[in-house]
From Swiss-Prot:
Name by which UniProt lists this protein: Uncharacterized protein KIAA1143 homolog
Region (Disordered): 30-66, 79-153
Coiled coil spans: none
Highest taxon, organism lineage: Eukaryota
Compositional bias ranges of the Acidic residues kind: 45-56
Compositional bias (Polar residues): 106-116, 130-144
Length: 153
């Protein structure tokens, strides 16, 4: 058993023709086991996920009433403050659940009632075709049955 603990791998020397070929081709050595075990340096980025200055969108003001860059920065700051206030956990550590606001039946149907005339026409045609197809099925069922004796019982 002690022989197993002393086993190690020794990488043989690379032949000269292979090293010459790699040099001619400009071969770059791939990652090895040791390089994969190395820890990557941690990037020092903001943890809040904010964009860097050069990655932020460019603000173009066309009219007097448009938002300026300063206004956008103020709004972003207010949003960050609001989210921090909402995310703050209670001091006693208990999680509190809020009851959802009940919706009135009129509120949910008010947006759904706005329907185009094209959709109404399609629904009407579907209903009329549904009655016609049921009549056709009755006629076809008598024509297509092969065992009339089984159904006459």
């Amino acid at each position: 058993m002690s022989k197993r603990n002393n086993v190690s791998y020794v990488k043989p020397a690379e032949p000269s023709f292979i090293s010459k070929f790699k040099k001619d081709v400009c071969y770059k050595e791939g990652p090895t086991v040791d390089t994969k075990r190395q820890e990557l340096p941690i990037l020092s980025e903001d943890s809040d996920g904010s964009d860097k200055e050069d990655e932020q969108p460019q603000v173009v003001v066309l009219r007097k009433g448009d938002l300026s860059e300063e206004d956008v920065m103020k709004i972003k700051q207010q949003i960050k403050e609001n989210t921090k206030d909402e995310e703050a956990a209670p001091s006693d550590g208990k999680i509190l659940f809020k009851k959802p606001v009940k919706r009135l039946s009129g509120d949910t149907t008010s947006g759904v009632n706005a329907c185009s005339t094209k959709k109404k026409k399609q629904e009407d045609t579907k209903e009329s075709s549904g009655t016609k197809s049921s009549q056709k099925q009755v006629k076809n069922s008598s024509l297509l049955s092969f065992d009339d004796e089984d159904y006459d019982d």
